[in-house]
């Protein structure tokens, strides 16, 4: 039997998809890239914001055509969309045969393998009813040299703009020994970069007995994996501490790369968002990081157009962005949804105003990023090769560039470099987000 899986959404969703693909292969099923040739179609969905919901529904309907026009016999929907809408979704999408919430990924294999006699059409246990899945065989969806490792699931916070706790449940951390075992296996299989992800990586281990810290996990991984890059994403300012900063800035194989989404820098807006820190707290945190390592790279995410965001609040955010001078920054426009606590707040910002503020943020960041990247011209940087172009050029990333969200390095060289190779590159040029160079 042939099965095709479409994965939507974030890197954390990608890990769930890779675990399912591993389970399919272990069951003796053939995983195929082309949905037209599959007997069973699976779509792992996202439902974080309205655009993600729309994309998921459109994808399901597009795949459903293979049931009526092709060889597909079964269409299975799993992940955040069924978790959010449940039986309502099943009623609206008769094209799909089975629906599984985020607490039932481990049961998708039953529907795929034709063991559905024990299943109802919708399988929706509480999202946190099942512990984090132990290390298992995965079929890596993207490049085998850069692999995401999910260290925890769920979130205990209640930010008013976020639906994740409802979709993913309370935080559950994986035992550190289990993560180290998986990391060693991935490195043995060819991984050159491990990217740690969770809803909040810096809260890792607080729910374990006895509690452990992200810093202790990173030290164990640093000792275990050798000369590869270990990168951490999705850090929260409230759960960062001096020990974590010290470990990340002192260990050679831990990228001194701090992805800390701040969302805003107006104390009034932060309070409405359900964030517990202040702008002063954020300034102190980033000062501490750069004091520990002046070459540390800072990335953040901000949210503009949040209900009640006044012009003065936005100016505080803009001043904060330019003052800290983040190496990388992503911005989003607030997406209202009746499922959010923020839906009931007053002072909703018009879409025109929100778009204008977004444009101002990104314009400011282009200038900041251009200046910071220009400082790297003339330096020699290790670059992880990701692609060989037909014209003899190569594309890759330096340690200060995370996959998918940051820029890349385009370089020339006489060597026959392959994806996964690490090459010393002299940086010769810089733009707003990307670098050019020559292999040395």
Swiss-Prot record:
<dbReference type="Pfam" id="PF18693">
    <property type="entry name" value="TRAM_2"/>
</dbReference>
<dbReference type="InterPro" id="IPR020612">
    <property type="entry name" value="Methylthiotransferase_CS"/>
</dbReference>
<dbReference type="GO" id="GO:0035599">
    <property type="term" value="F:aspartic acid methylthiotransferase activity"/>
</dbReference>
<feature type="binding site">
    <location>
        <position position="162"/>
    </location>
    <ligand>
        <name>[4Fe-4S] cluster 2</name>
    </ligand>
</feature>
<dbReference type="GO" id="GO:0051539">
    <property type="term" value="F:4 iron, 4 sulfur cluster binding"/>
</dbReference>
<keyword id="KW-0411">Iron-sulfur</keyword>
<feature type="binding site">
    <location>
        <position position="159"/>
    </location>
    <ligand>
        <name>[4Fe-4S] cluster 2</name>
    </ligand>
</feature>
<dbReference type="Pfam" id="PF04055">
    <property type="entry name" value="Radical_SAM"/>
</dbReference>
<keyword id="KW-0808">Transferase</keyword>
<keyword id="KW-0004">4Fe-4S</keyword>
<feature type="binding site">
    <location>
        <position position="10"/>
    </location>
    <ligand>
        <name>[4Fe-4S] cluster 1</name>
    </ligand>
</feature>
<protein>
    <recommendedName>
        <fullName>Ribosomal protein uS12 methylthiotransferase RimO</fullName>
        <ecNumber>2.8.4.4</ecNumber>
    </recommendedName>
</protein>
<dbReference type="GO" id="GO:0006400">
    <property type="term" value="P:tRNA modification"/>
</dbReference>
<comment type="function">
    <text>Catalyzes the methylthiolation of an aspartic acid residue of ribosomal protein uS12.</text>
</comment>
<dbReference type="InterPro" id="IPR013848">
    <property type="entry name" value="Methylthiotransferase_N"/>
</dbReference>
<feature type="domain" description="TRAM">
    <location>
        <begin position="374"/>
        <end position="440"/>
    </location>
</feature>
<keyword id="KW-0408">Iron</keyword>
<comment type="similarity">
    <text>Belongs to the methylthiotransferase family. RimO subfamily.</text>
</comment>
<keyword id="KW-0949">S-adenosyl-L-methionine</keyword>
<feature type="domain" description="Radical SAM core">
    <location>
        <begin position="141"/>
        <end position="371"/>
    </location>
</feature>
<feature type="binding site">
    <location>
        <position position="46"/>
    </location>
    <ligand>
        <name>[4Fe-4S] cluster 1</name>
    </ligand>
</feature>
<dbReference type="InterPro" id="IPR007197">
    <property type="entry name" value="rSAM"/>
</dbReference>
<dbReference type="InterPro" id="IPR006638">
    <property type="entry name" value="Elp3/MiaA/NifB-like_rSAM"/>
</dbReference>
<dbReference type="InterPro" id="IPR038135">
    <property type="entry name" value="Methylthiotransferase_N_sf"/>
</dbReference>
<dbReference type="InterPro" id="IPR002792">
    <property type="entry name" value="TRAM_dom"/>
</dbReference>
<feature type="binding site">
    <location>
        <position position="155"/>
    </location>
    <ligand>
        <name>[4Fe-4S] cluster 2</name>
    </ligand>
</feature>
<dbReference type="GO" id="GO:0046872">
    <property type="term" value="F:metal ion binding"/>
</dbReference>
<dbReference type="InterPro" id="IPR023404">
    <property type="entry name" value="rSAM_horseshoe"/>
</dbReference>
<dbReference type="InterPro" id="IPR012340">
    <property type="entry name" value="NA-bd_OB-fold"/>
</dbReference>
<dbReference type="GO" id="GO:0005829">
    <property type="term" value="C:cytosol"/>
</dbReference>
<feature type="domain" description="MTTase N-terminal">
    <location>
        <begin position="1"/>
        <end position="117"/>
    </location>
</feature>
<feature type="binding site">
    <location>
        <position position="80"/>
    </location>
    <ligand>
        <name>[4Fe-4S] cluster 1</name>
    </ligand>
</feature>
<dbReference type="GO" id="GO:0103039">
    <property type="term" value="F:protein methylthiotransferase activity"/>
</dbReference>
<keyword id="KW-0963">Cytoplasm</keyword>
<dbReference type="Pfam" id="PF00919">
    <property type="entry name" value="UPF0004"/>
</dbReference>
<dbReference type="InterPro" id="IPR005839">
    <property type="entry name" value="Methylthiotransferase"/>
</dbReference>
<dbReference type="InterPro" id="IPR005840">
    <property type="entry name" value="Ribosomal_uS12_MeSTrfase_RimO"/>
</dbReference>
<keyword id="KW-0479">Metal-binding</keyword>
């Amino acid at each position: 039997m042939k099965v095709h899986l479409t994965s939507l959404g974030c890197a954390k969703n990608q890990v769930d998809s890779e675990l399912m693909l591993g389970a399919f292969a272990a069951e003796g099923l053939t995983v195929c890239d082309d949905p037209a040739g599959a007997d069973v179609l699976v779509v792992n969905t996202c439902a974080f914001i309205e655009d993600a919901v729309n994309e998921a529904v459109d994808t399901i309907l597009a795949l459903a055509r293979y049931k009526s026009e092709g060889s597909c016999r079964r269409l299975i929907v799993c992940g955040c969309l069924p978790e959010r809408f449940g039986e309502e979704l099943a009623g609206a999408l008769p094209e799909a045969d089975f629906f599984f919430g985020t607490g039932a990924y481990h049961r998708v294999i039953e529907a795929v393998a034709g063991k559905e006699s024990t299943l109802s059409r919708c399988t929706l246990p509480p999202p946190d009813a099942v512990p984090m899945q132990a290390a298992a065989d995965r079929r890596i969806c993207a490049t085998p040299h850069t692999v995401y490792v999910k260290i925890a699931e769920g979130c205990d916070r209640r930010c008013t703009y976020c639906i994740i706790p409802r979709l993913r449940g309370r935080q559950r951390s994986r035992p550190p020994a289990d993560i180290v075992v998986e990391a060693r296996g991935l490195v043995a299989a060819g991984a050159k970069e491990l990217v740690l992800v969770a809803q909040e990586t810096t809260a890792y281990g607080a729910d374990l007995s006895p509690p452990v810290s992200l810093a202790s996990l990173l030290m164990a991984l640093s000792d275990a994996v050798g000369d590869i890059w270990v990168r951490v994403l999705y850090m929260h300012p409230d759960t960062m501490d001096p020990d974590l900063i010290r470990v990340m800035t002192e260990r050679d194989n831990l990228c001194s790369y701090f992805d800390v989404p701040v969302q805003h820098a107006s104390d009034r807006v932060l309070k409405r968002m359900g964030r517990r820190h202040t702008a002063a707290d954020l300034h102190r945190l980033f000062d501490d990081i750069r004091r520990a390592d002046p070459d540390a790279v800072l990335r953040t995410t901000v949210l503009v157009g949040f209900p009640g965001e006044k012009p003065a609040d936005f100016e505080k955010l803009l001043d904060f962005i330019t003052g800290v001078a983040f190496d990388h920054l992503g911005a989003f426009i607030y997406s209202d949804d009746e499922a959010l606590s923020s839906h009931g707040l007053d002072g909703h910002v018009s879409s025109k105003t929100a778009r204008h503020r977004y444009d101002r943020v990104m314009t400011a960041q282009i200038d900041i990023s251009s200046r910071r990247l220009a400082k790297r011209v003339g330096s020699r940087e290790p670059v992880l090769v990701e692609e060989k172009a037909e014209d003899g050029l190569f594309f890759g990333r330096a340690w200060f560039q995370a996959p998918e969200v940051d820029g890349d390095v385009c370089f020339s060289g006489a060597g026959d470099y392959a994806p996964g190779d690490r090459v010393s590159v002299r940086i010769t040029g810089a733009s707003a987000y990307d670098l050019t160079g020559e292999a040395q």
